[in-house]
Amino acid sequence: MRRRNPAALKPPRFPILAFDERELRLALGSVFNLKWLVPGESLVSILWKFGCANALAADFLVQLIDPDIDPSVGVAPVREVVNLMRLRRLLRLPENVLHASLLDAAVPGRYHPAFRYCRQCAAHGYHSVLYQLNDEDRCPAHRQSLETRCLHCGEETPYIVNASLVEAPFRCVSCHSHFSYGRLSLLSTTPAMRRRDRAAISHRLRVRSDDNMDVPRPEQRPRSPADDLRAMRR
């Protein structure tokens, strides 16, 4: 019987590298579109759409935001805590959009600790940073009172970016009932939100940015010749 060469049984000198298939997929290119967002969209709302579009597990997405935190604990969505550069590399969105999606920790007591929502906006897959301000009581687009408690179980959802919140898009973290009037599509809010509703939200953001420093001014699109023509006709 032929004996095997002992040298052939030695382990290879190079290491066998393990990789995460999800990280490789994101490195090759994530799926996201700036047109899916409405002005003033919160980071929580953005992450829900990003996670849905790229089929990411909630705990994995939270770790991508900050690898040093426990996904079950999470991180507060405020500018002084979240690494904006890391967030920009992950989501591939303009810095001003991400800056506007976060709260300002320099203004204590101004924000509600529970997730506040408009049921109609939730039906369109939208949540605004405006809704977390204590002195904002109604949605500027639909004039509905902002809710904090689930209409099914009565519990509140903490406004913290953790695995429990990320895995429940526009749903209660306690009972997983929808905050909206029914199931919704997360991939785009543009077709669902009427132009006048988007304009009302943008107007309210501009008013808040003029009066306070806690809400950045929404991004302005470049003027077109059609805009100049309409201005001349007024």
Describe the predicted segments one by one.
Residues 1-114, 119, 125-127, 192-194, ...:
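A structured, charge-rich N-terminal accessory region that forms the first stable segment of a protein
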Residues 101-115, 127-133, 140-146, 161-167:
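Short, flexible, mixed-charge glycine/proline-rich loop motifs
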Residues 120-121, 138-141, 152, 174:
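Short, cysteine/histidine-rich loop/knuckle motifs that typically chelate Zn2+
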Residues 121-123, 134, 155:
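Secondary-structure-rich domain cores
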Residues 147-234:
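Domain-exit/linker segments immediately C-terminal to small folded modules
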